[in-house]
Amino acid sequence: MPRQDRKADGLITLNLTASPENGYDEAEEGKLDFETDTISEEVDIVKRQTWSNKAEYILATIGFAVGFGNLWRFPYLCQKNGGGAFLIPYFISLILLGIPLFFLELAIGQSLRQGPIGVWKAIHPYLGGVGLASVVVCLLISMYYNMIIAWCFYYLFVSFQAPLPYSTCPSGVNCTVNEECKLAGRTQYFWYTKALGATTSIEDMGDFQWHLCLVLLLAWIVLFLFVSRGVQSAGKALYVTATLPYIVLAIFFGRAVTLKGSLDGIIHMFKPQFSRLLSPLVWLEAATQVFFSVGVGFGTLIAMASYNPRHNNCRRDAIFISLTDSFTSVFATVVVFSVLGFKAHGSYDECLSLYGGANNTNLPHGVTIQQKCHNLTYWLSESFQGPGLTFIAFTEAILKLPLSPLWSVLFFSMLLSLGLGSMFGILEGVLNSLHDQKLIPLRKELLTGLTCFVCLVVGLLFCQTSGEYWLQMFDSFTGTLPLLFICFFELVGVSWIYGANRFYDDIEYMLRMRPGLYWKITWRFVSPLIVFVIFVWSVLNLGLKPITYSVWNSKEGDVKSVEYPNWCLFIIAVLICASCLCIPAVFFLRLYQSVISRRRRDTEIVRDLLETSAKKPPEKNTE
């Protein structure tokens, strides 16, 4: 067990002993000193679970970092911001922002071997709110993120039938094609009307979609079984959830490159438009994507690193995992656009066969075949991001493949693996701190069950026919500004409040090497500046533009953007402030406690002096 002694010179000495049974390195003994002028409370490091081996830790961290955003947001940003040219600001941002922040979080978690709240209380009592804010963000994201996994479960289940249920439009009046489906397209119609039963406004709450309630319950049961026994049991499942996405992506790529139009899709995606690099917005979006893609600010990386042996090379891990995350984004983009290139070719050929040649009588009056079908570039330029890419565009492409149910099962199995890997990390960010700090005095299994149940109950909000609009709100505001706010204070807290040189000493103790100039410059100056600029830009963007969300328009068979009603703006403010306010709240609480403690101490000193003076006998007059 760790032993903690307070030395006379004002240093806290931590004597730590590890064994092969409790960790994946050999037994070690070491000392780690912290100056107590910034740590007013003794660092309480208790015996904790550790990863069974290094592979499980790497797979868990990759599984958390690689998520839905790699598959459905990065390709959209590449298409929007100059194709292959977008990779230049993306990788520059990764070097200046993503990797330094990733290393910082792994280092402080591994050094102090506590969850987010415990780590930041140890670094400085006034910074305890940083860890609390991370826990609140993870809890809010957990409430809606599992709904996306539930959607994947639903699509996986309906994939076990032929033909696929979204392969045709239902019949309308007099055996004609349903007009709404004809306008929307078969996959978009199925998504909004059958899967979601979407209303036309967030104000129209609608009824519960019971099939969504059931798959949401299933998603939480699976996650509970995944997480309840801690990292050692979850590590075994990570061998599947972290590797399956790469296997499925490779299979899709191998099939896609043999299809007509796949090369056109890849060329369209990566053809560089270097003129776009002159736009500051492109650089901001690249930095923002890096920031959210690597998963910093959640506290999850701190929690996962806390299960590591103290001398694990977390610098090498940070570089490897960050580059793996970026490689996954690029590879997923190649796969997505090779499949979408095949889809675009098919749609273009269908349009030509329907309206070209002898069928030109089908054209509306005064409309030419060029105006109706455009060209291949037009079909390739269709923009999808978020759920629309996976549940609408990609499913449409799957329908054009032979044995489409098999490809659908593979695709949604991959999405489930991506989602479960990320949810394990997000939920671990909550449970780690609640358990370590004993905020809820329950065993880990009971605490996990209680957390899952609370999130399930709140998640029923997203099972209503207006649920997708609520999910848009939560997704847009719970993990954007708050994470930027948290990471800014992480960088300032470590580099300027705790002290950069002291942090370098801690890393030198762990890694047997001192951080170089690159790390010092990025941690102290470059990364905080980038985060601050992104935060200011995000706030201005939020304040200067109307806050909108996308709703289903059944009359037009398409989505449109509408402004949130005023009462929703209040909820948005609560979602943002719920985590952000934790940082100043804890700061002022600690400041108040410090003032009260100082006054009490001064009062006791004065009282002791008065009592001593009263007890002292009067001096005798010798004259």
Map each language-model feature to its residues:
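Membrane-embedded translocation segments of transport machinery
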Residues: 2, 10, 18-51, 235-460, ...
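Membrane-interface "cap" regions at the ends of multi-pass membrane proteins
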Residues: 2-72, 101-106, 129, 175-210, ...
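Flexible loop linkers connecting adjacent transmembrane helices
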Residues: 35-39, 73-87, 103-132, 155-172, ...
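Transmembrane helix-boundary motif of multi-pass solute transporters/channels
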Residues: 53-92, 103, 227-233, 300-313, ...
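Hydrophobic, membrane-embedded alpha-helices of multi-pass small-molecule transporters
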Residues: 59-69, 141, 146, 184-196, ...
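Transmembrane-helix bundle segments that line or gate the permeation/cavity pathway
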Residues: 67, 94-212
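Extracellular/lumenal N-termini and interhelical loops of multi-pass eukaryotic membrane proteins
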Residues: 146-204, 262-276, 343-395, 487, ...
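A generic transmembrane alpha-helix motif of multi-pass inner-membrane proteins
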Residues: 460-462, 472-495, 515-603, 621-623
